[in-house]
C-alpha cells in the first residue's frame, strides 16, 4: 500500500508511504534506490501543487496507483534477476559462442535499472493514447529522454532536456 485509503473506499489519502517502506526486495542491480527516489519525486511535486492551491487534492489519489504499477515491475525484475543469477551457465556461454544470460539481462533492463523506464498509464494526468499522433517519436506517459540537438538559430550543440527546464508550470 502506498496510502491509507482502504480498498473500495473513495476519498483523498492523508498518509503516504514511499521507497522501501512499501516495496522491499533483494539488492541485485541498484534499481531499488531509483524506484524509491521516483516514489518521493512523484509524491513531492503533487503535494507541493496541492498545498500551494495549484491542483485539486484529488490529484493525490493518483500516487498510489501509479507507484504500485512501478513497484510490481520492480518485484518482477527482481525475480528475473534471481532466476538468471541462479541458473547454471550453458555450454554455449562457457565457450563464448553465446553472450552470458546475466549480460543479456543487464542490457535488457538498462532503462529500468537506470531509473528511466517509467511508464504511466492513462489517468487523471495523462491523456489517452488517442492523442499519440500529436507526440510523434514519443510514447505518451513515458519518461522523456534527453537527446543531443543543434539549435538552428546559432548552430549551438545542446541537450534537449536542458532546454525544457522543470519550473512547476503546466504546459
Please state what every model-predicted region is.
Residues 4-9, 43, 49-57:
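Secondary-structure transition/capping motifs at alpha-helix termini
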Residues 1-35, 70, 74-78, 158:
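FAD/FMN-dependent oxidoreductases across multiple families
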Residues 49-171:
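Helical substrate-recognition/capping region of FAD-dependent monooxygenase/halogenase enzymes
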